[in-house]
A protein has these predicted regions:
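Short Gly/Pro-enriched turn/cap motifs at secondary-structure boundaries
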Residues: 78-79, 151-155, 187-189, 226-228
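A glycosyltransferase accessory/donor-loop signature
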Residues: 1-12, 22, 160, 165-305
Length: 305
């Protein structure tokens, strides 16, 4: 049986090297023949030990982000410049790449991504899941109404952590260029960077994926509203937010599966120091969060967190 290649793209700085290793190790472990993957890693200045560690796990093709690209992004302490790298995929990927699967580093893959890769885009520029925390463009922390005039009230809002992208459609329709222009216009007000920009400028050019391909890691906790159907067979779990399982002990059903994969890769990369802040966030997540979540959500929706 001839192998078939899945093009995977990721973007990190050194701080996210370890979770990227976990995500790629879990992805490779779940991938079934005839699929194989080639990983395009967008970065600014990753250290050689980090690149070597990742390359020991997968077929790695590093791509350096140029100053020309990064110069179009706002300097924001909340995000590393690499966070918006998906917007540069149409100009940085090899010309023969027609489809690419972009994955955030803070994920755990639990099922074969072959069916995800084969998803029918139905003529749209990309596929993604509806963001469970921001289900509509008009939801709190979605696209501000003053900016998103013309977007229907019921337009869904996508999470950019998993995106199956038609690269040629992005080029021809100027998807990334429009998003970059949006970021440039409202640099001091943009909230979720490229995710907000894509939802604001191309809200009608993406198609939804099954939620199981980008499930919040809080599935099963008393405050989580994820549907039972989506939670029954998770394909990819997303550790979005401040609770990062490579830095701290966390609560929830995916803490142990993550720890098992982490143990397989941790020695391949430079060690990361844990801080007192990590310890306090861990304590909050494991002991207090189930009871304090309504307040957390209240603060988050008002962009105070």
């Amino acid at each position: 049986m001839a192998s078939q290649t899945i093009a995977v793209a990721c973007s990190i700085d050194d701080r996210y090297a370890l979770p990227l290793a976990v995500m790629l190790e879990s992805l490779a472990a779940c991938l079934s023949p005839p699929w194989q993957m080639r990983v395009y890693l967008l970065h600014r200045n990753l250290s050689q030990p980090v690149r070597d560690g990742i390359a020991s796990l997968v077929d790695l093709h590093p791509i350096t982000l140029s100053g020309t690209c990064l110069g179009r992004l706002p300097r924001d302490h909340r995000y590393p410049l690499e966070a918006a790298a998906p917007l540069f995929l149409p100009v940085l990927l090899p010309a023969d790449i027609g489809r690419v699967l972009f994955l955030d580093a803070d994920m755990l893959v639990l099922d074969d991504i072959g069916p995800l890769w084969s998803h029918d885009l139905a003529g749209r520029a990309w596929a993604a899941t509806v963001d469970p925390a921001i289900p509509l463009c008009r939801s709190p922390r979605g696209v501000p109404r003053s900016i998103g005039r013309g977007i229907p009230a019921d337009a869904p809002y996508c999470n950019a952590g998993v995106m199956l992208i038609d690269v040629e459609a992005w080029r021809q329709r100027g998807v990334a260029e429009r998003a970059l222009d949006f970021i440039g216009r409202i640099a001091d007000r943009v909230d979720f960077l490229h995710q907000e920009a894509l939802n604001a400028t191309a809200w009608n050019d993406w198609t939804p994926l099954d939620p199981r391909w980008n499930l919040p890691a809080t599935v099963g906790r008393r405050f989580d509203q994820t549907s039972v159907e989506a939670a029954a067979a998770p394909g990819i779990v997303h550790f979005a937010g401040r609770m990062k399982p490579w830095r701290m002990r966390i609560a929830g059903r995916f803490a142990d599966p993550y720890a098992r994969v982490l143990a397989r890769v941790v020695d391949r990369l430079p060690a990361q120091n844990r801080t007192m802040r990590d310890a306090l966030v861990s304590l909050y997540d494991r002991v207090l969060r189930d009871w304090c979540y309504p307040w957390e959500r209240f603060i988050w929706e008002r962009r105070l967190l």
